[in-house]
Amino acid sequence: MRRPPRSTLFPYTTLFRSYWDFVNVSGRQVPGLCVAFSRDGIHWVKHSKAPLLQGAYGDPTQPPLSAESRSEPPTRPAISDVIDLMWDPRRDCFVIYSKTWIDAPDGRRFWKRAIIRTESKDFIHWSMPQLIIVPDDGDSGQIHGASVFYLHGVYLAMLQRLDFGGFDRGGTGNMPAELALSRDGIHWQRSFQDKMFLPVTGKGDTFDAGCLWTSSTPIHLPGETRFYYGAYPGWNSDLVNDASGIGLATLPRDRFVAIEPADGIAQVTLKPIQLGNVNRLTFNADATGGEVRVELLTAEGYRVAGFTQDHSIAITGDSLQHPLKWKGKTMENLTAGRYQLRVHLNNARLFALTLGQ
């Protein structure tokens, strides 16, 4: 990871690395979080203290007694061997989303994989890991990792959905990626569990047929977002002889999800927003086979004269930034205040709305 913009941490360091490793501590090998620093991405200096957070993995046993836990992590759950690092611009800190293990119904450890979160202001002192995402009734398997990035004021995650039962019994071992959303990076909405954001076929011997390893650093370009991922054919692949590699998936800009009619025609009324200083509205929409019209309502839900559906100039075609227009009116004619946008969809899909000044 590059040094965050305007950060005064480590002024001569430009790159930060977090990784899982085993460290000799008093004659025994202790796994956990290690970090390193670099100016050029080639020559790295490991931090003298390691591990900064002790990790855990092992056989399915009951947790040890408190008096016998000195060699264990200070608290459970602990980090494990999948570590995704991000810079949180809202909290102004580093954040790691790591794999962890949750207990089985009978209390034994290392039953299923889940996700914990830890943060740091200086990349060295990390908070106590917090359990944030666990498999629920909608999951057929486990959650192996979470690659999180911040975009347009929200946190998005690609959850690695590993198809194994408890203690890795049953299942295919396939691992596609699910899209999840959060407003704070801690509490997550999983509205797309039934449709994978990055799917796998689970068939054939192509390098990305079975398991995808996602990244928390997608590349955002003016017209598209690029997602690079590591992959191999399956969980039990022969990593020496089977194909593996780095893949690329592309997405038109901001087209993560869409609102579209279930039966041709629909309307969506958005929450009231302040439009006093907004002089331009654009829609990211595909109306190739239909049209989109937009009208304004007051915050109380009543139509605004001159900005009704009848006055709206229809949006047609496919574009990342359709301008919203009305006959004889512009946003500058609008009295300052809070308004609702009512979007009328006719065989069209709406992906995003942008407010401009």
Predicted region positions:
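Short, small-residue-biased leader/transition segments that mark boundaries at the very start
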Residues: 1-4, 8-15
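Carbohydrate-active catalytic/glycan-binding domains of CAZyme proteins
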Residues: 11-357
